[in-house]
C-alpha cells in the first residue's frame, strides 16, 4: 500500500494501484495460497519466494483489471508490484515480522507448561524424598521442590526469549538491494515503518544502518540460541522425569507417568516414558536447527547473506516443534503424574545421606564413620547413632527429622 501510493505519480496508475491492493487483500484473506509452491529452503537469498509473491499478486491484479495472466505490460511483478522494494529488504522484513508473531505464539504454551509444573510442586509439597547429586544419595527434599525447580528453570528462559525476540522489531525495509535505498522513492522507508507499526501494533523500528542490516542475520542466530537454551533445560527435565519414574519395581519409582501405550511387542505389561522421550527428541531437533542457523549465519558475504532462507525455515520449524512439544508434555504427561509417597519416604528412611545433618553436632569425621558403617552393614544411620550412644533418641528424632532438614 505504501509502495503503491508513493509510486503512483509516475510509476503506477490508479487502476494498477487499486488492483494490486485488492490482490494483496485476497492473499491475506487466505486465497491463492495454492499458488505458492516454492520450498522455504532456496538459493537466491529469498528471491524465489519474493518473485513468487510478486507474480501471484501481479497476475491476480491483471485479472481484476480485465487482462489475462502474464500480460505484464499492464501490471508487472517487477516494475509495479515490486515498486520501491527489493527481495533483500522485503524478504527479511517479512521474516522478522513472522518470527516475532511466532514468538508471541510460543510464550503462552511455555507458560502453561510452567504452570503445570508449579501445580505439581504444590500438590507434592509435603512428600519427602531423597535428593541426589551425581546420581548418589545426597540429602532429603520434597518432591514438590523437584517440580518447582523444573518450573523455575524454565521461567528464567522467558526473559531470554523476550530479549532475543526484540531484535526482530528492527527491520531494513527501504534498504532495497544492499542498503543504499536505490530505486526506492524518497521517504519510502519511514512511511513503511509507520504503516507496519499501525498494522501490527508493535514498536517496529528502522535499522540505523541499512547496509549493515541487509547482510546481518544475527537476530535469527540469537533467537535460535534462545530456543536451544530452553531445550537444554527441557532435556534435563525430561531425563529426570524418565529416571525418577523408572521401575516399576526395580527403579527409583518416585512417581508414575501416565501410561500412553504398551511399551513392548514382546514384554507384556511394560510401559515406556514415551512422552518425555518425544520431548527429548524435539529438543535434539531444535538444537540441531540452531547449529544450522549458526553455520548459515556466518555464511554472509559482502552485502548479503544468501543463506537466510534456511535460517528462517529452521527457526519457524523450531517454534512449531516446541509449541507441540510443550503442549504434549503438559497434557499427556505432567498433568497426570502421580506420586508414590510411600516409596519416597522409604528411600529417605534407608538413605545414608541423612548423616549430613549430623555434621554440625558430631563432626565430619564421626559422621563419615557412621556413613561407612551403615553402608557396610546395612544398618540405618539412625540405629547406628543410637547403638554407639552418640546421641539420645530424642536428639536424633529432632536432628534427623526429614521435615527439619528441608529448608
Task: Report the location of each language-model feature.
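Intrinsically disordered, low-complexity linker/loop segments enriched in Gly/Pro
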Residues: 121, 127-130
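Internal glycine-rich alpha/beta core junctions
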Residues: 48-87, 105-121, 139-293
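Alpha/propeptide regions of enzymes that mature by internal proteolysis
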Residues: 11-19
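Short, small-residue-biased leader/transition segments that mark boundaries at the very start
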Residues: 1-8
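Internal maturation/activation junctions in enzymes
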Residues: 17, 23-26
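Catalytic-core signal marking the mid-to-C-terminal active-site face
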Residues: 157, 208, 212-216, 220, ...
Amino acid at each position: 500500500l505504501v509502495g503503491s501510493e508513493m509510486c503512483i505519480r509516475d510509476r503506477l496508475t490508479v487502476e494498477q494501484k487499486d488492483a494490486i491492493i485488492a490482490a494483496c487483500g485476497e492473499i491475506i484473506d487466505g486465497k491463492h495460497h495454492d499458488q505458492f509452491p516454492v520450498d522455504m529452503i532456496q538459493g537466491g537469498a529469498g528471491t524465489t519466494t519474493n518473485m513468487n509473491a510478486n507474480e501471484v499478486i501481479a497476475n491476480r491484479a491483471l485479472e481484476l483489471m480485465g487482462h489475462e495472466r502474464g500480460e505484464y505490460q499492464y501490471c508487472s511483478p517487477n516494475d509495479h508490484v515490486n515498486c520501491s522494494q527489493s527481495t533483500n529488504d522485503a524478504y527479511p522484513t517479512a521474516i522478522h515480522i513472522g518470527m516475532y508473531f511466532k514468538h508471541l505464539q510460543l510464550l503462552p504454551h511455555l507458560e502453561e507448561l510452567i504452570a503445570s509444573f508449579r501445580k505439581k510442586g504444590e500438590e507434592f509439597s509435603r512428600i519427602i524424598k531423597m535428593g541426589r547429586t551425581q546420581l548418589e544419595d545426597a540429602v532429603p527434599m520434597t518432591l514438590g521442590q523437584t517440580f518447582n525447580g523444573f518450573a523455575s528453570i524454565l521461567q528464567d528462559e522467558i526473559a531470554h526469549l523476550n530479549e532475543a525476540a526484540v531484535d526482530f522489531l528492527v527491520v531494513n525495509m527501504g534498504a532495497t538491494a544492499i542498503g543504499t535505498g536505490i530505486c526506492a522513492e524518497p521517504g519510502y522507508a519511514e512511511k513503511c515503518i509507520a504503516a507496519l507499526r499501525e498494522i501490527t501494533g508493535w514498536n517496529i523500528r528502522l535499522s540505523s544502518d541499512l547496509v549493515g542490516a541487509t547482510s546481518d542475520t544475527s537476530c535469527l542466530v540469537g533467537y535460535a540460541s534462545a530456543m536451544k537454551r530452553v531445550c537444554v533445560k527441557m532435556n534435563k527435565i525430561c531425563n529426570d522425569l524418565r529416571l525418577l519414574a523408572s521401575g516399576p519395581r526395580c527403579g527409583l519409582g518416585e512417581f508414575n507417568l501416565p501410561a500412553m501405550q504398551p511399551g513392548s511387542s514382546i514384554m507384556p505389561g511394560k510401559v515406556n516414558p514415551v512422552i518425555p522421550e518425544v520431548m527429548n527428541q524435539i529438543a535434539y531437533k531444535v538444537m540441531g536447527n540452531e547449529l544450522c542457523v549458526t553455520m548459515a549465519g556466518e555464511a554472509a558475504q559482502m552485502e548479503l547473506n544468501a543463506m537466510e532462507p534456511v535460517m528462517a525455515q529452521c527457526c519457524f520449524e523450531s517454534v512449531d516443534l516446541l509449541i507441540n512439544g510443550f503442549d504434549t508434555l503438559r497434557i499427556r504427561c505432567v498433568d497426570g503424574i502421580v506420586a508414590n509417597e510411600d516409596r519416597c519416604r522409604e528411600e529417605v528412611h534407608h538413605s545414608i545421606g541423612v548423616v549430613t545433618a549430623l555434621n554440625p553436632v558430631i563432626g565430619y569425621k564421626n559422621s563419615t564413620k557412621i556413613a561407612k558403617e551403615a553402608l557396610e552393614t546395612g544398618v540405618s544411620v539412625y540405629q547406628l547413632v543410637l547403638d554407639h550412644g552418640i546421641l539420645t533418641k530424642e536428639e536424633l528424632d529432632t536432628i534427623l527429622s526429614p521435615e527439619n532438614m528441608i529448608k
